[in-house]
Design a protein with these regions (language model features):
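Conserved SxxK-family serine transpeptidase/carboxypeptidase catalytic domain
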Residues: 271-313
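Conserved catalytic or metal-liganding residues and their short signature motifs at active sites
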Residues: 19, 28-271, 278, 297, ...
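Short, positively charged and aromatic/hydrophobic N-terminal segments
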Residues: 5, 10-19, 24
Length: 370
């Protein structure tokens, strides 16, 4: 009986139907394994591709670790922007930028401006900045200079506008009138400092910005001091411009301001040498002679009473505050010291002044300065 059961089991186990079923099951399991492995492989490839794509999108646009800028002009197109990118050093990822630009529809959103390319900015982030017009501001320093033409020449390299456009705005009568100044007094609006502006700022907008800074600078306290000195803010700037040119010594400036205020109050001509240089347009003059003193100009304070029509340079805040905080004394004259230190000998009487002037003239002669 036992042998019969074993025989039946052996028959079932080794029957053709059973063998086929086992084979079919093995095939199915193998297919499943292959499908799983293929799926895992495809997923791995997708992960790698996604990683590469993310790297290309968010990796630094170029190899520059410091500041680097892309300047886009008003007439630039998407193609000219990409051409500018390709012309940059440090291996820019222009192809990736084109791809990102297509994703962001940059072609219809080209904005002029100055854009940061360096400091590790990613390509996708860069293209978002370009599309949104998110410029990097410019640090614009307003310097102490002699003329409006000098100012235009100094500011232009930092801006899209050229020096001619800036100078035109600085002398535009209608624009200046809207700001309460004219071509003679507009230098007072320029308060030397460093300001943040956009590279694309127009000359007109720049003047309005400078006017706002001027209004901020002239606090209630400064206005009160100007009034106490008997001057308007523009007159303070005009006198400060003379003080600026008379001495670079900050400690001496309040004394110089006090001397000129004394002369104004006594009805004396200022007789300031820097105004003669301005009238002649010769700022390199080292020795003022009698022939220079007769220059026919409203700025020549040897010929004209009172202050000049406007500032003879862009005065620094230090010179302006020297006028507002002028020194109270009885000096009416001053002359450069004979030691050429850049400081001055002050005098209350004309006789004292002549003695000081004689010593200085002798020192000039010894040095052969004419």
């Amino acid at each position: 009986m036992k042998n019969a059961k074993l025989l039946v089991f052996h028959f079932v186990l080794h029957s053709p139907c059973t063998t086929f079923a086992l084979f079919k099951r093995n095939v199915m399991e193998t297919k499943k394994k292959r499908i799983v492995m293929a799926g895992a492989g495809a997923a791995l490839v997708l992960v790698i591709m996604a990683g590469v794509a993310l790297y290309l999108l968010f990796a630094p646009f170029c190899g520059t670790k410091g500041n680097a800028y892309l300047y886009i002009d008003a007439d630039d197109t998407v193609d000219s922007v990409y051409f500018k990118m390709e012309s940059l050093p440090d291996n820019p990822r222009t192809s990736t930028a084109r791809f990102c630009g297509a994703l962001l529809s940059y072609g219809s959103h080209v904005h002029p401006g100055r854009y940061q390319l360096g400091k590790g900015i990613g390509t996708f982030q860069l293209m978002r900045h370009l599309r949104g017009g998110l410029q990097e501001p410019v640090r614009l320093t307003v310097p102490v200079v002699h003329t409006l033409a000098d100012m235009a020449a100094r500011l232009a390299p930092r801006l899209q506008a050229d020096s001619a456009a800036l100078y035109h705005a600085f002398t535009d009568a209608a624009l200046l009138d809207s700001l309460g100044v004219d071509t003679a007094t507009v230098p007072a609006l320029f308060i030397p400092n460093t300001y943040e502006v956009f590279w694309t700022i127009t000359p007109s907008a720049l003047l309005h910005r400078l006017h706002r800074e001027y209004e901020t600078f002239w606090t209630a306290e400064r206005k009160q001091k100007a009034e106490a000195a008997g001057l308007t803010p523009v007159e303070v700037s005009t006198l400060a411009s003379i003080v600026e040119q008379e001495s670079a010594n900050s400690a001496e400036r309040p004394a110089i301001a006090g001397m000129y205020l004394n002369r104004l109050r006594q009805g004396m001509k200022l007789q300031a040498d820097p105004t003669v240089k301005f009238a002649l347009g010769d700022f390199a003059l080292r020795r003022i002679l009698h022939a220079h003193l007769v220059a026919d100009s409203p700025y020549n304070t040897y010929r004209n009473q009172g202050l000049p029509p406007g500032p003879i340079c862009i005065p620094s805040p230090d010179a302006i505050d020297a006028v507002l905080n002028y020194q109270h004394h009885d000096y009416l004259y001053m002359c450069a010291k004979e030691d050429f230190s850049g400081t001055h000998n002050f005098a209350a009487t004309y006789e004292e002044h002549l003695a000081n002037a004689r010593r200085y003239a002798e020192a000039l002669n010894r040095r052969g300065i004419k």
